[in-house]
Amino acid sequence: MKVRASVKKICANCRLIRRKRKILVICVNPKHKQRQG
């Protein structure tokens, strides 16, 4: 899980999701997991 100021989709499988005021990226590739904060 990477914590970043700017969260972006890295590949076509990445999905942007909002959970409890946090923006997450969930993907098939575990390296693409990100959250903002």
Swiss-Prot record:
InterPro entries tied to this protein: Ribosomal_bL36, Ribosomal_bL36_sp
Pfam families annotated for this entry? Ribosomal_L36
The portions of this protein that span the membrane are none
Q: Which GO terms describe its biological process?
A: translation
User: In the UniProt record, does the keyword Ribosomal protein occur?
Assistant: yes
SUPFAM superfamilies given for it?
Ribosomal protein L36
Cell compartments where the protein resides = Plastid, Chloroplast
Among the GO molecular function terms of this UniProt record, one is: structural constituent of ribosome
Keywords, comma-separated and alphabetical: Chloroplast, Plastid, Ribonucleoprotein, Ribosomal protein
GO terms under cellular component:
chloroplast; ribonucleoprotein complex; ribosome
Source organism's superkingdom? Eukaryota
Q: Which family does it belong to?
A: Belongs to the bacterial ribosomal protein bL36 family.
Listed name of the protein:
Large ribosomal subunit protein bL36c
Look up and give the organism this protein is from: Stigeoclonium helveticum (Green alga)
Lineage of source species: Eukaryota, Viridiplantae, Chlorophyta, core chlorophytes, Chlorophyceae
Gene name of the encoded protein:
rpl36
